[in-house]
């Protein structure tokens, strides 16, 4: 059992704590699942882009799935090789495209004809040939939260089969484009295998047609999205996921690219917070803690439910349902409703579980609240991997006040 009391002697709440052993094992599980085929596991930085986490993954020969030039530079800073980086996203600016081409990453995932032409124009101005992949929208329901579903035709991501074919043929004829991959990503937090099987089969068929037309494909990018069990849901077995994708690619000599994020880091992370007050209103019990929605947005944004446990000794205290809420001035600043917890006192400590993904990476300074301290548990030792922001950091980049 981890000794939290030692942490509290040196670190004030709230803070994030990541178990690096869990991150390492989760990544190695992906490498093992796809070992029967040429593959590249590109960790999705959007889930958690802390440099220490990226450095850990770089040492394991991870690639990177990036959606901004900032993420690309983070990946490079952490030691991930350019030839293992892919650049995705529906809205790449000309500046980002130019910088990316100069960095000579593996390829850019293209999401529209206009973007393709922009890449071609910039590549021509640089006198180079841009390696590209085209993201195909297979019009398949991922059966996940609508905010993170990306594979239906009404979603903003990717292009349909007909337009994809036109884009590939355009790229094939261009002196400044090199189409080397097909790509799809139908959504995040997938808990069912059938949508990914259907998408893999559909896009594999398209890939075979493209190869028959003389397009020299080398990669088959299946995106990411395997879900995590937040509420004891049954999840996809990684081995089954990999095998079904491998089956869909029979007859195709392509390197598989997979872009996991959540399933690599989610279960490694905890948000440790302490009780400020208890109150009752209209016979409802509230436990008010020092972490807020600005620190961890998922419950407010997605109505996500993360288990909460008490780590302060509380034996013998009466247990009753309560809402665990933060100090931010929003009614949505609620971590969990109706959770059964013992009577709590100011200073008691709680742990919000499985927050390693889309926790710190989505944090903000809303209500002028500094971003949190982040700690790593590695080889039985605790170290700081992000300092807590000081109050002065809230306005450090602002200008315009004389004499301040």
Ranges and model annotations:
Residues 23, 46, 68, 100, ...:
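Conserved, mostly hydrophobic/aromatic
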Residues 1-130, 172-178, 205, 209-212, ...:
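A charged N-terminal "starter" segment
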Residues 54, 77, 97-102, 119-122, ...:
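Short acidic, glycine/serine/threonine-rich loops at helix termini
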Residues 139-277, 367, 378:
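Active-site loop/helix belt of alpha/beta enzymes
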Residues 2, 18-25, 48, 114, ...:
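Conserved active-site and cofactor/substrate-binding residues in soluble primary-metabolism enzymes
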Residues 63, 86, 107-109, 133-135, ...:
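Structured core elements
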Residues 2, 8, 244-246, 253-404:
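Charged (often Lys/Glu-rich) extended helix/loop segments that serve as interaction or gating elements
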Residues 45-49, 70-71, 91-92, 112-114, ...:
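Active-site-proximal loop/turn and secondary-structure-junction residues that shape catalytic pockets
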């Amino acid at each position: 059992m981890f000794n939290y009391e030692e942490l509290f002697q040196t670190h004030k709440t709230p803070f994030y704590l990541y178990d690096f052993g869990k991150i390492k094992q989760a990544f190695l599980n992906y490498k093992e699942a796809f070992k029967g085929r040429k593959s590249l596991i590109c960790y999705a930085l959007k889930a958690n882009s802390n440099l220490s986490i990226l450095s850990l993954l770089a040492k394991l020969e991870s690639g990177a799935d990036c959606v901004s030039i900032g993420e690309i530079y983070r990946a490079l800073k952490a030691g991930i090789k350019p030839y293992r980086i892919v650049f995705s996203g529906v809205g790449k600016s000309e500046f980002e495209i130019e910088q990316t081409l100069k960095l000579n990453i593996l390829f850019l995932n293209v999401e529209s004809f206009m973007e393709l032409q922009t890449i071609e124009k910039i590549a021509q101005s640089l006198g180079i040939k841009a390696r590209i992949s085209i993201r195909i929208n297979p019009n398949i329901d991922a059966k996940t939260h609508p905010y993170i579903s990306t594979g239906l035709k009404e979603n903003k991501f990717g292009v349909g089969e007909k337009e994809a074919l036109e884009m590939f043929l355009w790229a094939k004829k261009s002196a400044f484009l090199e189409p080397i991959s097909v790509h799809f990503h139908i959504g995040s937090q997938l808990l069912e295998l059938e949508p990914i099987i259907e998408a893999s089969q559909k896009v594999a068929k398209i890939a075979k047609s493209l190869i028959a037309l003389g397009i020299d494909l080398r990669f088959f990018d299946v995106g990411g999205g395997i879900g995590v069990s937040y509420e004891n849901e049954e999840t996809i077995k990684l081995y089954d996921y990999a095998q079904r994708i491998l089956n869909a690619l029979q007859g195709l000599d392509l390197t598989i690219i997979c872009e996991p994020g959540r399933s690599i880091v989610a279960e490694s992370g905890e948000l440790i917070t302490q009780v400020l007050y208890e109150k009752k209103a209209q016979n409802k019990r509230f436990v008010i803690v020092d972490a807020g929605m600005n620190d961890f947005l998922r419950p407010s944004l997605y109505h996500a439910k993360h288990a909460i446990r008490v780590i302060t000794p509380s034996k013998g205290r009466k247990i009753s349902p309560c809402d665990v809420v933060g100090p931010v001035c929003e009614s949505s600043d609620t971590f969990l409703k109706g959770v059964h917890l013992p009577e709590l006192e100011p200073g008691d400590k709680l742990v919000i579980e499985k927050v390693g993904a889309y926790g710190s990476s989505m944090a903000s300074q809303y209500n002028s609240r500094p971003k949190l301290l982040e700690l790593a548990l590695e080889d039985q030792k605790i170290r700081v991997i992000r300092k807590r922001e000081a109050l002065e950091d809230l306005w450090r980049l602002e200008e315009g006040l004389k004499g301040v």
